[in-house]
Amino acid sequence: MLKDMRRWFWLLLLAVICLAQDSVDPWAKNELMEPAALAAALHSAKPPVILCTAFSALYRSKRIPHALEAGPGSKPEGIALLKKAVADLPKDADIVLYCGCCPMVKCPNIRPAYHVLHELGFEHVRVLNIPSNMHEDWFGKGYPAEAGT
C-alpha cells in the first residue's frame, strides 16, 4: 500500500509541475494590459505602438487600428518581421503586443515576440490580455477594429 501511495504521489507531483510550466509567463502582471485600457489609449495624444504577432491571415482579416504586422512570433520569418517593425523605434517606446489566435496560455506567438523585444533592449513592453481569442475578447466586445487589406 505504501508503495502505491508513493507512486501516486510522484505522478501527482509530476502532473502539478507540468501544469505549472504551462502557466508560467515571462511577463509580470503589471505588464499585462487590459483591452479597455488599450481601447482608451488608442485615443490618447501618444498611443502605444501596437504589434500584432498573429499569423498573417488573422492580421489581414481584422485588427486593432494602427497595429503593425509583426508575426507570427512562432516562426523565424515572423521574428524577422517583428525586428523590422521595431528597427527604428527608440528603446523606451511604449509597445503593446497582441496575438489572439487562441487562448493566451497556449499561444505560440506572444512569448517568443516578448522575449525578442526584451533581448533587443526595449524597456516598455506590455502584452494585451486576451484570455480566449481576439473575436471574443476584443472584437466581440465592441472595441475599435479595422479591416485588413
Listing of model-derived features with the role each one plays in the protein:
Residues 10, 28, 49:
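Short, flexible active-site loop motifs that bind/organize anionic cofactors or intermediates
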Residues 42-50, 66, 124:
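Short active-site oxyanion
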Residues 29-43:
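A short, well-structured juxtamembrane/interface segment
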Residues 2, 20-32, 60-149:
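Rhodanese-like catalytic fold shared by cysteine-dependent sulfurtransferases
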Residues 38, 49-54, 67-70:
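Short hydrophobic beta-strand that contains or immediately precedes a catalytic carboxylate
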Residues 2-9:
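Bacterial N-terminal signal peptides that target proteins for export
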Residues 34, 55-56:
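Aromatic-Pro/Gly-enriched surface loop or interdomain linker
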